[in-house]
Amino acid sequence: MRFTHRITNSRLGFFLLSAFTGLLVGSSTVALIECVDFLQGLLFGEPATDDPNQLDSRFSGWSVLLVPIFGGIVISVLLRFIPGQRFHGIPDVMEASALRAGKMDVRSGVSAAIATTLSLGTGAPLGREGPAVHIGASLTSWLAEKFNLGRTQSLTLLGCAAAAAVTASFNTPIAGVIFALEVVVGYYALRVFAPVVIAAMGAVIIRHSIYGNRPEFTLPDYQIGSLWELPVFALLGFVAAFVVQGFIYLVIFCRAGWDKASAPVWIRPAFAGVLIGAMALYYPLALGVGYEGTSLALNENLPLVLLAGLLLAKVLGGAVAIGSGTPGGVFSPALFIGAMLGGVYWYVATALIPAELSSQGVYSVVGMAAIASAMLGAPISTLLIVFELTIDYDLVIAVMLAAAMASTFMQLMPHSSFFRWQLAERGINLNSGRDQGLLRTKTIDEFVTQNFIRVNSAVTLTAVETSMYSHRRYIAVVLNDNEEFIGSLSTDELVAGVVTDREATCKSAMNASEHAIPDSTSLLAALQSLNELDTNYAPVTKTGDDAEEVVGVIYRSDVLKALYDMMRAARSEEYGVN
C-alpha cells in the first residue's frame, strides 16, 4: 500500500503508470486484432493476396452465408448469459468518465473481448476499435482500483486507455491522443495531456513491434484539382450528415422491429446473422471490419455499381447488427461507408458538373472524413485519423471543410452523433456539460433532510405554529385520518394563514400533495420542479404499495449548493492539480 501510494502521488510515478497502461492496452488491442484475423482465416480461409488493390477471394462461396449465421447463433448463446443482456462499448466509457469517476466493471471488458472476437471473426459488418477502447478502459479501471487512485487520476487513466487503444488499432498516435481528450475525457488540459501522450507512445511501441511503421491505407499522390471545388466538398459534408442520421434511424427501426416482434433479446443476433449472411452473398466485401473494401475504394478500384451496393450493404448490415445487439464498433464502418459514399458522390458530381473535378480517390478520402466526423462527433480527432491513416496532407483543406460541415449539420439534426444518441437512449445527456450530466444522474435522496413535523389535517394553524416552534422545524407534513400524506405547510404559508384566520385548520392553508417529489428524482429534475412550483422546498415521498410515505424534505438551497459543488468539481478536474 505504501509503495502504490508513493508511485501514484508523484508525477514521475503516475507517468510510469501511464506508460504501463499504454503497453497493457496496446497489447490487448493487438491481441484483439490477431484473434479476429485468426478466426476469420480459420472460418473464411486465408487471403489469396496481400495486395490491397485486389479483391479478397476468401470472402466467396457459401462461407459468406453460413459463417455469419453461425456467428449470430454463438453470440445469441453468449448474450443469454451476459448480465443485462447487453455488450458494452465507447458510450459506456464516456458515461464512466462523465458520471462514474472512471469506474467500470472489468468483467464487461472480458465479455466484450470474447464477444467482439466472435462477432467480427464470423463477419459481423462492424468495427473493432470501439470494443478495443472499452476493453482497455475496463482494464485501466481495474488498475485504478488496485492502485487506490483518486477521481482525477482515474479519469486520466481512462483517457490513457482510450488513446492507447485507438493508437494501437489504427497506428495513429496523434489522433489517439486527441480522441481521448475530445470524446472520453471531454476536455483539454495540460495535466491530462502528458500522461495520455505517454500512454499513446507505449501503444505505438507495441504496434510497431508487431506490424511495423506502415500506414493502414497506401494511396497514390492525390491532389485537389481546383479551389473552386470547395463548395462541392462542403456539400459532401452535408450529404454525409444525412447518411449518418439515416443510419441511426435504421438502427432505431431495427430495434423497434425486434421489440414489435417480441423477440427475446438474446436470440436477435442469430436472426441478424441470417440477414447479414444473405447480404454477403452479393456484397462479401461488406463483411467484417472492411478495410479491404475501403482500400479498394480509396485506390479507385471499384465501379459505381459496386460502390453503391457496398454503401447500402454496409449501412443496412451495420444497422441490423447493432440493432440486434451484436457487439462491435462504428469506427471502421464509418470509414468504409465514407469511402463508398465519396466514390458514389464523385460519379454523380461528374455527371452533373461540366467542369473537370478531382479524382474519385480524393472524394473517397474526403467522404471518409465527413462520415467519420458525423458518426463519432469528434471532428478534430477524425481529421487526424484520416491524415495518419493515409499519410496524405495535400487534401487538408477539402477534408477539413467536409468534416466541419458534417459536424455542423449533425448539431442541427435530432442526433448530434452516434455515441451521443446511444447515451440519450439511456437517459444520459452530455451535450450540456458533465456537471449537468451529473445532476441528471444524481438523485435527491442524499440531500433530503428531516427538518419537518407531521400534523393531522384537522389541527388548527395555531397548534401547528406552536408545534413548529417547540420542535424548531420549518415544514409541516399534513396527514389525513388514515395517516396518508395529503399536503405540506411551510412557515411562510403558516404565517399567511395565521394572519387570515388563526383557528382555521392547516388543511385550508397547505400545498396539495402534488407538490411532493419522489425520492428517485434527479437533482436536475428536482430543481426544475421547484422552479415550476415557485417554491423553496418540497416534501420527498417514497411511493409504497398503498400510499405515498414522506421520507423527508428537500430545499432549493441544498439543490443549488449541490449544483455549485459539482460545477466546481468539474472545473477542478479540467484545470486543477488533483
Per-region residue spans from a language model:
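Alpha-helical transmembrane segments and immediately membrane-proximal extracytoplasmic
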Residues: M1-T441, D445, Q450-N451, V455-S467, ...
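Nucleotide-binding motor/catalytic cores of P-loop/tubulin-like NTPases across gene-expression machines
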Residues: S488-T491, E503-C506, L523
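Short hydrophobic beta-strand motif reused across regulatory alpha/beta modules
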Residues: I178, L384, I486-D492, V551-V559
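Structural signal for short hydrophobic segments within the conserved structured cores
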Residues: N451-V455, S508, S513-A516
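Residue-level signal for well-ordered, solvent-exposed loop/turn and beta-edge residues enriched
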Residues: E484, D546-E549
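The conserved cystathionine-beta-synthase
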Residues: V455-R472, L479, V498, A516-T543, ...
